[in-house]
């Protein structure tokens, strides 16, 4: 039963991909259709049109295979050592800086979400206390 649920959830994600591809081709956008599909999925999740539970297991399944997708890219880089030797320092600087920026952005985002969660908990505690006193 879980296998069928994962397959259906992956199909839902694939539908978002296909819709994104169609929009990209229809409007000749300079952005990949897969990115358009991800933005549509993000909007639908944010507006709660699509609940997370509908895609959670399928997305987790796909994420478990994500490292395998980096192997062909790294093999391609290894096949062209002249690019690495010529632009190696620039690549290293770019990777290090982008990693630092990503870590900082993730830290700020997690702190913001934690503050919102604490405020929500405080409001719930306050409303329970007020309702008990009435």
Curated annotation (Swiss-Prot):
It is found in: Cell membrane. NCBIfam families: PRK01658.1. InterPro entries: LrgA/CidA. Keywords: Cell membrane, Membrane, Transmembrane, Transmembrane helix. The chain crosses the membrane at residues 3-23, 35-55, 58-78, 89-109. It comes from Bacillus subtilis (strain 168). It is a multi-pass membrane protein. It comes from the Bacteria. The lineage of its organism: Bacteria, Bacillati, Bacillota, Bacilli, Bacillales. GO terms for cellular component: plasma membrane. The keyword Mitochondrion does not apply. Its main location: membrane. The keyword Membrane applies. This is Putative integral membrane protein YxzK.
